[in-house]
Amino acid sequence: MGQAFSITPARRLSGEIAVAGDKSISHRALMLAALAEGESVIEGLLPGDDPRSTAACLRALGAEISGIDGPSVRVRGVGLGRLHEPADVLDMGNSGTTMRLMLGVLAGQPGLFCTLTGDRSLRSRPMLRVVSPLRQMGARIWGREEGGRAPLAVWGEQLRAIDFVSPVASAQVKSAVLLAGLLAEGLTSVSEPVRSRDHSERMLRAFGAEVLVDGTTAAVRGPARLRAQSLRVPGDISSAAFWLVAGSIVPDSQLLLSGVGVNPTRTGVLDALAAMGADIAVENRREVCGEPVADLRVRSAPLKACTIGGEWIPRLVDEIPVLAVAACCAAGKTVIRDAAELRVKESDRLATMARELGRLGAHIEERPDGLVIEGGHRLVGAGVESHDDHRVAMSLAVAGLVATGTTEIADPDCATVSYPQFYEHLARVRQQ
């Protein structure tokens, strides 16, 4: 158990922040570079625990990766279908994205045997949503609960293309199937009820794969051949969300968040905060390596309640913990619904946020698929727990900026999973 993090109310927040590189894009950049022919250069890669887990797995499979903690990461790929059999178990750490996407990468490598595991949290998370469609393609995957929980064992096979209809909008499911489809003969497609984030489709196309998108259906034609690329990873809007909320609720604040990815499949947090009355300007829009990027300027503003649900959820699911903090400071009753997926993240984020914000005095009701938050009640500093969940830890730190007294967050270091510089940036922008 690490040392607790203490936070007291901020008088104001000001300054410019270059938020950490996008976690979702960082994973995909490493994986596709490892599967490509030649040497790729990736700038702005997130230097967090999760991408390190991905890099370690790819090294064990034969890719050469250097400079993982520096500004430019170099990856010499092995080419599709040429991964090496690892000598040991592949440890995914805490990264669900690594495990689910690597299942798709490994399933179509004929004759390759791998065992995948992770930490206690990851071993409890559901994997059948990915394993089932891969099995439909001919994958041989075994594990606890009939392949529903790690550790998982994979024996690579020649896969067949399928048309998969996903019951949920999940970028991880979609990406795993599309990655497996790179080595299957023909067109592999995934249809979703609502379009999930599309980083995989954009990046696969950049690396030379034939990708087709029609509404909520994405498809890839195999067998494919990937070519090395030079990439820049934009700032993570999920990390920017902490500052968007903090800058909104701390009085007299103004923050500029530079170089943030504003992919429309990820900008639900901007829509939700706009509905709550936040003062956020999207400036200097541009495109970087196929991804839309902008600078975000946030100024403090009185917030009002809104309803968050439906088609918004896939576009802001990772930001719901910090949006719950915003709701505590908004006038009226905010309803968050259709978010049962949060129960199977690094923690049960609905239960966790209800419990921990309740400790700070929030009027919050947990529901099976969401939260109901009666805003406008003053938060009071107290001891709270991160539950070893990076987004919970950082959300509680944002709450501590407006809670009276001192808020003590137990096990705060889990923030390094997605935003290693978070506490450093917090110290820099707060004005005592």
From Swiss-Prot:
Known catalytic reactions: 3-phosphoshikimate + phosphoenolpyruvate = 5-O-(1-carboxyvinyl)-3-phosphoshikimate + phosphate
Function: Catalyzes the transfer of the enolpyruvyl moiety of phosphoenolpyruvate (PEP) to the 5-hydroxyl of shikimate-3-phosphate (S3P) to produce enolpyruvyl shikimate-3-phosphate and inorganic phosphate.
Pfam families: EPSP_synthase (PF00275)
Organism of derivation: Gloeobacter violaceus (strain ATCC 29082 / PCC 7421)
Name by which UniProt lists this protein: 3-phosphoshikimate 1-carboxyvinyltransferase
Keywords: Amino-acid biosynthesis, Aromatic amino acid biosynthesis, Cytoplasm, Transferase
Subcellular location: Cytoplasm
GO biological process: amino acid biosynthetic process; aromatic amino acid family biosynthetic process; chorismate biosynthetic process
Family matches, as InterPro entries: Enolpyruvate_Tfrase_dom, Enolpyruvate_Tfrase_sf, EPSP_synthase, EPSP_synthase_CS, RNA3'P_cycl/enolpyr_Trfase_a/b
Keyword hit for Nucleotide-binding: no
Binding site for phosphoenolpyruvate: 23, 96, 125, 172, 349, 391
Enzyme kind, highest EC tier: transferase
Main location: cytoplasm
Keyword Transit peptide: no
Similarity comment: family membership: Belongs to the EPSP synthase family.
GO cellular component, one term: cytoplasm
Oligomeric and partner information: Monomer.
E.C. designation(s): 2.5.1.19
Binding of 3-phosphoshikimate, residues: 23-24, 28, 170, 172, 318, 345
Record-linked PANTHER family: AROM/DEHYDROQUINATE SYNTHASE (PTHR21090), PENTAFUNCTIONAL AROM POLYPEPTIDE (PTHR21090:SF5)
Cited HAMAP family: EPSP_synth
Catalytic site positions: 318
Pathway membership, UniProt: Metabolic intermediate biosynthesis; chorismate biosynthesis; chorismate from D-erythrose 4-phosphate and phosphoenolpyruvate: step 6/7
